[in-house]
Amino acid sequence: SVEDILKGVKISGSIPMDGFFSELELGINFADRSKEKHQPEGNINVGIQGDTTIAPDLQYGNVNLGFAGLGSIPSWNVPGAVARYMTFDPSETSAGYLIAKAWTVKEKITTAYAKANIDSQVGSIPVRGNVGVQVQNTDQSSQANYFDGSAAPGKQVKPINDGTTYTDVLPALNLAFNLGGDQTVRFGLAQQIARPKVADLAASVDFGVDNTTGKPGAGGGNPKLDPWRANALDISYEKYFGNKAYVSAAAFYKDLKSYIYKQSRDNYDLSKYTPGSTATTNFGTFSAPFNGAGGTLSGMELAASLPLGMITSALSGFGVQASASFNNSNIAVKDPDSSSSVGSGAIELPGLSKTTSNLTFYYEAGGFEARISQRNR
């Protein structure tokens, strides 16, 4: 089972202004998130009565499965039969491998911001947008358990509590220039962050020993993960034709200060988990999300939308949308001893496609909508 609770409070206000800035917004936001996962497991065993005939009140009769070549087979109330004739006692701690499947992650994020909205002109060109700053404080923690094979029976399940706190100052500038003729140029400059996945912050550790080599290994989450951080530059051009048709081109550049990737570190000290196990050494492979530092991400995107009714009324309601993106990345792996590293050289960002394209044909009319899409990456 998974329980994910999010609570939030936001207080904000605005002050009208005259001149280049039309309004000043001030606010503070409190976000509290708690995610808890439990995955108890167990075997279903025959009860003390042993093998027996299922009672008539639990039988449904025969079902014809001739279409599958199985003929007629009996059917019954399976949940009822399990409850009456079998035992099932799921647990999170009955085996060492189950312990790492339960964890709790908590995040407390406080964000204060100030934003000045722009609705003015630069020369004869109308410009809209905003400039502002956010100050964000994050307190993240995780609680889980691990199996200590050296402890006395009944005391082998031990807690893990870990986490970190950090503060980010995030300035941003966003501008949109109206060039006339339904043309817009957008410009953005900002320091950005992206939070880690909640499951990546789990403190749980799954430990095991290779029976052939005696080498230990472990994997889990990392409650001390920093977010993705980047200095970002975005610029785009948009041209509209009527209400729905448009073409656009956008380019972006991100100077990555930190990123997150799954890494396997060799010769990792696992002495905390090896006592009582069959391991012949305390050092093995540990796999978990880690932060990398330094790199770039850049690219461009082309997009177009064309309602075919603009060509001929016979195709009214039909349309086509297309887009293509082209990406380049370059990161430096933090730990040269990791199996995902190439020494001091750079690698591409794992999981990022160099080229992605989308093509969609659609029909929209009278409240009815149908789409056929293709995506390549």
Regions found by a protein language model. Give the residues of each.
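Outer-membrane beta-barrel translocator domains and adjoining extracellular loop/strand segments
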Residues: 37-43, 95, 141-148, 198-204, ...
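Transmembrane beta-strands of outer-membrane beta-barrel pores
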Residues: 5, 28-36, 133-141, 189-195, ...
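Extracellular loop and loop/strand-boundary signature of outer-membrane beta-barrel proteins
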Residues: 1, 12, 97-103, 154-162, ...
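Residues on the lipid-exposed face of transmembrane beta-strands in outer-membrane beta-barrel proteins
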Residues: 11-15, 112-118, 173-177, 225, ...
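Short loop/turn motifs that connect adjacent beta-strands in outer-membrane beta-barrel proteins
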Residues: 16-24, 39, 121-127, 180-182, ...
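Gram-negative outer-membrane beta-barrel transporters
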Residues: 253-255, 272-377
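Outer-membrane beta-barrel signature, preferentially recognizing the C-terminal barrel domain
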Residues: 101-105, 164, 193-256, 278-306, ...
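Flexible glycine-rich, low-complexity coil/linker segments exposed to the extracellular/periplasmic environment
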Residues: 1, 40-101, 266-290, 373
